[in-house]
C-alpha cells in the first residue's frame, strides 16, 4: 500500500492547557489476515508549549480520530524542555535517527522558519521563530522528527559549556 499523508496544512491548535498541537502525518496501514484485510491508521503528532517545550507521539487505531488522540496524549507525556536564545537555537547542530540526518542552524531575527514539512511542525509548536534547516538522507516523517528532537536535545547552553571547560560564561562568549 502507498503511504498517505495529509496534504492540507494543519493549524497549530491550542487547547485549554495552553499547549500547541500539530499533526505531522497520517498513514493508512493494512494487516492481511485469513479473512481479508484489516485497515488501520497510524498518526504522528508533535506538541509544544511555545517556549522551548516539545514532545512527539505516535498512535495507532482503526479510526483516524482515535489514532490522533492517542498520539497527542503520548506527545504530552513525552514533553521535553529545550533552551532557546531569542527565538532561535543556541548553536548549529546535526541530529540523526536511522538514515535521517537533520542540519539545524540558528538564524538572525526576521529570517523565519526555513525548514521542510516535519521539521517545520516541530519548530512551530516549540516557539522557535528563526531557524534554518536541511534534511539529509531519509525523508520518512517519523525518522525526520526523531532526528530533529535528537539534535535539539543535544544542544548545550553557554553555561553548560563553561562549566565543562571550567571557565566563566563571559570567557566562552568572548
UniProtKB/Swiss-Prot annotation:
Q: Where is the S5 DRBM domain?
A: 19-82
Q: Which domain of life is it from?
A: Bacteria
Protein name per the record: Small ribosomal subunit protein uS5
GO MF entries: rRNA binding; structural constituent of ribosome
Entry domain remark: The N-terminal domain interacts with the head of the 30S subunit; the C-terminal domain interacts with the body and contacts protein S4. The interaction surface between S4 and S5 is involved in control of translational fidelity.
GO term, biological process aspect, one = translation
Gene this chain is encoded by: rpsE
PROSITE patterns associated with the record: RIBOSOMAL_S5, S5_DSRBD
Q: Does the keyword Ribosomal protein apply?
A: yes
Role, per record:
With S4 and S12 plays an important role in translational accuracy.
Q: Does the keyword Magnesium apply?
A: no
Q: Which family does it belong to?
A: Belongs to the universal ribosomal protein uS5 family.
Question: What's in the keyword line of the UniProt record?
Answer: Ribonucleoprotein, Ribosomal protein, RNA-binding, rRNA-binding
Which Pfam families does the record match to this protein? Ribosomal_S5 (PF00333), Ribosomal_S5_C (PF03719)
Q: Which GO terms describe its cellular component?
A: small ribosomal subunit
Its assembly, as annotated, is:
Part of the 30S ribosomal subunit. Contacts proteins S4 and S8.
Q: Which PANTHER family match?
A: MITOCHONDRIAL RIBOSOMAL PROTEIN S5
Amino acid at each position: 500500500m502507498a503511504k498517505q499523508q495529509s496534504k492540507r496544512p494543519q493549524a497549530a491548535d491550542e487547547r485549554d492547557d495552553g499547549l500547541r498541537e500539530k499533526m505531522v502525518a497520517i498513514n493508512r496501514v493494512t494487516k492481511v489476515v485469513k479473512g481479508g484485510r484489516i485497515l488501520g491508521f497510524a498518526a504522528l503528532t508533535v506538541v509544544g508549549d511555545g517556549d522551548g517545550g516539545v514532545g512527539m507521539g505516535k498512535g495507532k487505531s482503526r479510526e483516524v480520530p482515535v489514532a490522533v488522540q492517542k498520539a497527542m496524549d503520548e506527545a504530552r507525556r513525552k514533553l521535553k524542555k529545550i533552551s532557546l536564545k531569542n527565538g532561535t537555537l543556541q548553536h548549529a547542530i546535526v541530529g540523526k535517527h536511522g538514515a535521517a540526518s537533520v542540519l539545524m542552524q540558528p538564524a538572525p531575527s526576521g529570517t523565519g522558519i526555513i525548514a521542510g514539512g516535519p521539521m517545520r511542525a516541530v519548530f512551530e509548536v516549540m516557539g522557535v521563530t528563526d531557524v534554518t534547516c536541511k534534511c539529509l538522507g531519509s525523508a520518512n516523517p517519523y525518522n525526520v522528527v526523531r532526528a530533529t528532537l535528537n539534535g535539539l536535545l543535544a544542544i548545550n547552553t553557554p553555561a553548560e559549556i563553561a562549566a565543562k571547560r571550567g571557565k566563566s560564561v563571559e570567557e566562552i562568549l568572548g
